[in-house]
């Protein structure tokens, strides 16, 4: 077998192995391991057919670890965040449709906590703030114009 054919064969093996290793149920019928949800799994999502809506891992039927949600093109990330016991927990990033960051923040017990930065779709900072343990803005809050200059 020539090296090009061998390379194609090995690539196909990895592709099929990856696809077969996702969207599995455990012995109790709960979602387990890596899952990729497509439009058929979210019929009300208004996405075109056969595109990814979101993907991540399940443990005991609950979202755990890093999850990615996609914009309607099925490729551009919309949100990347950590889940713990089926709830957003920890650092996450939301993205504009042009792939630039929209927001960076941390969620603890379904509330903002710590630093939060929001961005315009041109990549310039729109807002910088801090959230206390109750999920309320605290301390110095800053707003910026779309050109990046501080609002007085």
Predicted regions and their residues:
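Bacterial Sec-dependent N-terminal signal peptides
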Residues: 1-23
């Amino acid at each position: 077998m020539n090296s090009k054919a061998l390379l194609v064969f090995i690539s196909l093996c990895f592709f099929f192995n990856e696809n077969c290793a996702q969207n599995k149920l455990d012995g109790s019928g709960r979602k387990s391991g890596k899952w990729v949800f497509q439009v058929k799994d979210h019929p009300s999502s208004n996405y075109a057919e056969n595109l990814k809506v979101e993907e991540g891992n399940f443990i005991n039927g609950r979202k755990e670890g890093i999850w990615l949600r996609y914009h309607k093109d099925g490729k551009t990330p919309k949100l990347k965040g950590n889940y713990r016991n089926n709830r957003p927990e920890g650092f996450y990033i939301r993205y504009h449709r042009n792939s630039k960051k929209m927001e960076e923040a941390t969620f603890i017990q379904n509330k903002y906590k710590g630093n939060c930065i929001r961005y315009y779709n041109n990549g310039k900072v729109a807002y910088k703030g801090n959230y206390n343990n109750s999920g309320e803005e605290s301390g110095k809050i800053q707003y910026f114009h779309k050109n990046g200059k501080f609002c007085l």
